[in-house]
Amino acid sequence: MKKNTFWISSAPRTGSMWLFNVTREILKISGSDVLPKKIPQWDEEMLELYEKQAMYDQNELNKYVLKLHTILNPDLPRSKILSTIRDPRDICISFLEFMKTDFQTALKSTKSIIKYSNTYNEYDKDYLKIIKYENIENKSIETVLEIAKFINCEIDYNLAKQISEKFNKDNVKKIINKNNNNL
C-alpha cells in the first residue's frame, strides 16, 4: 500500500514549520492534492484526522502532511516521518527569544530533543528521515532535494531552488508581516 501521510514530528523550535511548508510545496508541485486544506492547530486534531480520514483515503492523489510535537510509533500504516534536529543551545535561545519564556521553561522544552533523538535514531531509515536544522539554513536546496527523494517526488535543482527561496527566513518574515498588517 502506498504512503499517503507524511508526518512532521519534531521538538519545537527545530525547523519543523519550514519542513512542513516545504513538504507540502513539493507534493503540490508534484501534482498531489495536499491535505488538510485547513490546518489543525493541535496534535490531537492531527492524530484524529489521520485516524478518521487519511488512513482510509484510497485516492492516490491525496497526500496528507501532518505536523505535531509528539513522538510517533515506528509502524504507522501508510506513513513516513520527517523530523528535525537542532543544537540544544540554539533551541533554548530560540525559546527565550521568540517564545518569550523564562529560562526554566526554555530548558525543559529543549530537553525534549533528547527524547526525539534517542527514539527516532532506532527507527528504520526508509520510514523516518531526520533533517538537521543547520542544513535548512546552509544547504537548503540540497535539503529540499533530500526531502523530495524521501517522499518519492522527483523535482529538479531549479524547482528545489525556487522552493528554497520561497521559504527562506526573509521571505517568510515578509509574508508574516504582510499578514499581520492585513489583520
What kind of feature is each model-predicted range?
Residues 1-65:
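PAPS-dependent sulfotransferase catalytic core
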Residues 29-32, 60-165, 169-183:
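PAPS-dependent sulfotransferase catalytic domain
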